[in-house]
């Protein structure tokens, strides 16, 4: 049990006017470590007790069961708790050594399913750094939920349907070269896509033609379907090569096209419930009671829309996976779409729509400018990852020229640097893509955390340290205590990251733990013979294990040597 919980329960036993949870939420960290580790402010009791907060604090100290604490004192209106550092450090180090990579695991999910809609690139368009966020945030959220006891189901809802295929078919029929497309599919298809969009601005009839071709595709026209299948197959080969490089896997690649024959059920339910209304020849669901614009379900030409397909998708996923959470990792520009989707499902009496959560994220820019596939202003992800690996290799060769498997380590560091930089950013904030900053071994970066882990492994190898849970490891000095508190807090950080759907909490935790250890290492001679040597090595071991696990949750590898 964490110490705040112990304090809250002890205080609740003598403060009948406050519940344990309320007390827990009032507990805070004193301004200085000299004033203790945890403080309870007595202000909130002044009205009820009709006493000055200072007097209440003194009364609490007199009545409280202080067993297991180094000291408990009243300082003005605060009750300050000094924790038993030796006892807690022993418990924390023993727990980490016993539980290993299971340390911090919780069983909140009890094995229940969580679907995570993530990555979802558009077929026939290049995989750019713009797709990186949904991919790595989704993967990290899957890892975090697994650590919390859920069963994550990673779904790559491919953008393999829509008007853009009408545009692409028109472009290919006008200017396409089969041999050129087969030689370099994505690059050639991108050129066609950019060209058709540019020309359509001058010639609106191209838009009409694209719409007609997409309608043909929906109706099963053989020529349209053959071209669509070809675009899809060629794109997936390239996407899977990039996913392998990122070390990201999926449980399902069911994209938009998969739901072509699954939309009638949702439309039928809307009709049966009298929710479908005619509006200028189109069919809509009125959402005025939700303060939302009407949801357009079917256009005048009978073509379906994203929301129709997403209704079918949600219904299929609930039926197939019986999720307790359905997470959609999709950019901020889709906020209204997901609000409408949930509202329509709610109107259909699907209460499980409350379990659907849209996880937004900010934009990636380059030189502060927005990236756009349509305008051809993008940064391709694969060559960017290769450049990150190359930069990592250059730095590794400078630091450790004799390192074995340099290429493998450079891959882990380069790819990890790009992923970590993305994930350390507050989810709803965007960031400017800066490869030099990402791959730096200094500052708040992935390589900095990886290097701290590798340094710890080097210390443990030199000492031939073998952890033993039976040993009486304990430390009571201030420097060690800072690290112990970080390690003890790991499961709480994982839980909060899951609650807030925010992997940046794990990334920041890893940075703080690495910084705390590096500071400790600079001031403490860990390998020197002393009564604390084994306990210090146990602390290094525990720090390394938790750093590695934090990085794993972010989808980042931790090399043993750098």
Curated annotation (Swiss-Prot):
Keyword set includes Coiled coil: no
InterPro entries reported in the protein's UniProt record: Arg-tRNA-ligase (IPR001278), Arg-tRNA-synth_N (IPR005148), Arg-tRNA-synth_N_sf (IPR036695), ArgRS_core (IPR035684), DALR_anticod-bd (IPR008909), Rossmann-like_a/b/a_fold (IPR014729), tRNAsynth_Ia_anticodon-bd (IPR009080)
Keywords: Aminoacyl-tRNA synthetase, ATP-binding, Cytoplasm, Ligase, Nucleotide-binding, Protein biosynthesis
GO function term, MF aspect, one: arginine-tRNA ligase activity
Key word ATP-binding present: yes
Sequence similarity: Belongs to the class-I aminoacyl-tRNA synthetase family.
Subunit structure: Monomer.
Annotated protein name in UniProt: Arginine--tRNA ligase
Organism the protein comes from: Streptococcus suis (strain 05ZYH33)
């Amino acid at each position: 049990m964490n110490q705040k919980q112990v304090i809250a329960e002890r205080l609740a036993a003598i403060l009948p006017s406050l519940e344990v949870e309320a007390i827990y939420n009032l507990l805070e960290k004193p301004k200085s470590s000299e004033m203790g580790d945890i403080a309870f402010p007595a202000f909130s009791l002044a009205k009820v007790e009709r006493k000055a907060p200072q007097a209440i604090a003194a009364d609490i100290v007199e009545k409280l069961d202080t067993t297991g604490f180094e000291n408990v004192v009243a300082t003005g209106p605060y009750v300050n708790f000094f924790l038993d550092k030796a006892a807690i450090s022993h418990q924390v180090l023993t727990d980490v050594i016993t539980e290993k990579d299971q340390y911090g695991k919780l069983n909140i999910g009890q094995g229940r399913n969580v679907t995570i809609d993530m990555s979802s690139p558009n077929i026939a368009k290049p995989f750019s750094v713009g797709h990186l966020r949904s991919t790595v945030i989704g993967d990290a959220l899957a890892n975090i939920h697994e650590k919390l006891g859920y069963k994550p189901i990673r779904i790559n809802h491919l953008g393999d349907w829509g008007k853009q295929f009408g545009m692409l078919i028109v472009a290919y029929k006008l200017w396409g070269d089969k041999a050129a497309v087969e030689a370099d599919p994505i690059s050639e298809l991108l050129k066609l896509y950019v060209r058709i969009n540019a020309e359509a601005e001058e010639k609106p009839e191209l838009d009409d033609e694209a719409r007609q071709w997409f309608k043909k595709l929906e109706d099963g026209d053989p020529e349209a379907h053959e071209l669509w299948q070809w675009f899809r197959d060629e794109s997936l080969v390239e996407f899977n090569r990039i996913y392998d490089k990122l070390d990201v896997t999926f449980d399902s690649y069911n994209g938009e096209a998969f739901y072509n024959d699954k939309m009638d059920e949702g439309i039928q339910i809307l009709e049966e419930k009298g929710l479908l209304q005619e509006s200028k020849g189109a069919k809509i669901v009125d959402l005025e009671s939700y303060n939302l614009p009407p949801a357009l379900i079917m256009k005048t030409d009978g073509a379906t829309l994203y929301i129709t397909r997403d209704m079918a998708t949600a219904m299929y996923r609930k039926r197939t996976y019986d999720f307790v959470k359905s997470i959609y990792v999709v950019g901020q520009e889709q906020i209204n779409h997901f609000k409408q989707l949930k509202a329509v499902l709610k109107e259909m009496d699907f209460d499980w729509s409350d379990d659907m959560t849209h996880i937004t994220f900010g934009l990636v820019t380059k030189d502060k400018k927005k990236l756009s596939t349509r305008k051809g202003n993008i940064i391709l992800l694969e060559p960017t990852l290769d450049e990150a690996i190359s930069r990592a290799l250059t730095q590794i060769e400078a630091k450790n020229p004799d390192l074995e498997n340099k290429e493998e380590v450079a891959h882990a560091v380069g790819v990890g640097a790009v992923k970590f930089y993305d994930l350390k950013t507050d989810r709803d904030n965007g960031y400017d893509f800066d490869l030099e900053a990402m791959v730096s071994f200094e500052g708040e970066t992935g390589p900095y955390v990886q290097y701290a882990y590798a340094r710890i492994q080097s210390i443990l190898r030199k000492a031939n340290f073998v952890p033993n849970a039976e040993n009486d490891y304990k430390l009571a000095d201030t420097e060690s205590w800072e690290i112990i508190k970080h390690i003890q807090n790991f499961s709480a950080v994982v839980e909060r990251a899951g609650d807030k759907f925010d992997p940046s909490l794990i990334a920041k935790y890893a940075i703080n733990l690495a910084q705390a250890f590096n500071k400790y290492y600079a001031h403490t001679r860990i390998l020197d013979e002393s009564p604390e040597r084994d306990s210090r090595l146990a602390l290094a071991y525990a720090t390394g294990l938790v750093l590695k696990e934090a990085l794993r949750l972010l989808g980042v590898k931790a090399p043993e040597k750098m």
